[in-house]
Amino acid sequence: MAKRLSRVKIIFFHFVMWAVVAPPFLAAVALLSVSIIAYDILEHPERHQNSRRIWNIIATDLYYVYEAGIWHNQKECVQYDDKLLYKPSHGCHFVNKEFATDLNFSEDGRLTKSSQSASSGPPLFFAGDSETMGWGVNDDETFASLIASRVDVPVLNFGVASYGTVREILRIRMHPRFPEAKCIVIQYSWNDFDENKLFLTQGSLPSPTPERFQGLLSDYGKRRANFSDVVLHTFGLMLDNPLAFFSSVFGWHDFPLEDYDPMYSSEGTPREETEDANAFLTVLAAFSELDDKKLFAMGPSRFVSALAGGTRPGNVFPIWVDYADWYTLDMHPNEKGHREIATQILEQLDRTKEGRHCLARGP
């Protein structure tokens, strides 16, 4: 009996020891392993694929905090505008770790195949933020330019990085050919919501003063992130979001979960995709000049689904686009991604009478 009790005590002792020692040991192993992978992504993004795994999130976070050049914060890339705060300059050389590009603009927006040719007829307008503008690709590689090379109508690309829907509409409305444009493709991003909500709440955007513009021009890319930066950031995410962190480590769920979901506001309160869709439609309704135009809306799948599933005006048509190929660190579509987006947009437009009319392809 005494030997049996002694054996039970030994087993219980080892169980307690493992219960006490194993969790911090496993956490330390996870911290080190994730940090090593994230640092390798940061140093050698070409070795890795873009994903929502925790190591990709960490690498991208630190890339934008320390290393990335921001197009609209570079004085050679933007100029002051008294209505939009900033607009593209005539062009600049824009370089980051994963690309080196030349962006050229005219009064017709980012240069496309048709903006350099004698295309005639009602133009097809593209409005959006950095994805439409073509952050990370050259002029002839944007999806708007690729579409321009495959259709017989003029294609004008008015995308500008970090514009919300409000400024996107203001920009195209000021163009001389806006009255004759019958079709507009508008690309939506989750970060458009703040600008749209502010406009709807206050009735206008903050005054675009020269002082605010000067505040945008910053010195980015001050230093390279080092391994200690990676470890500290990894530890912070593991401490603040243990469930999401380990779910991503073991491949059970992409990171983020709720706490880091793009559908959460800066205050941390949940936001349904229907709020984005409703704000987007309300902004469009505020511009009566759009009433006689066909508006094709593309963006994240949940946003497009909310748009398609709700009540919307008869001139608004959702477009589903699968964003598959992105830069590993930079989180913008790469050259292949733009080719795929162009193909999908054309396929979507060709499926409807309204879309075919915009492409001048008959009934």
Predicted regions, residues:
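N-terminal Sec-pathway targeting helices
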Residues: 3-26
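Membrane-interface motif at the C-terminal end of an N-terminal transmembrane signal
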Residues: 25-47
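Membrane/wall-proximal cationic-aromatic binding patches
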Residues: 41-149, 320, 324
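Short hydrophobic segments within beta-strands
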Residues: 127-128, 187, 298
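Conserved SGNH/GDSL esterase-like catalytic core that processes O-acyl groups on lipids
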Residues: 133-209, 332
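Serine-dependent acyl-ester chemistry module
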Residues: 190-308, 315-327
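Histidine-centered active-site loop/cap adjacent to the catalytic His
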Residues: 329-363
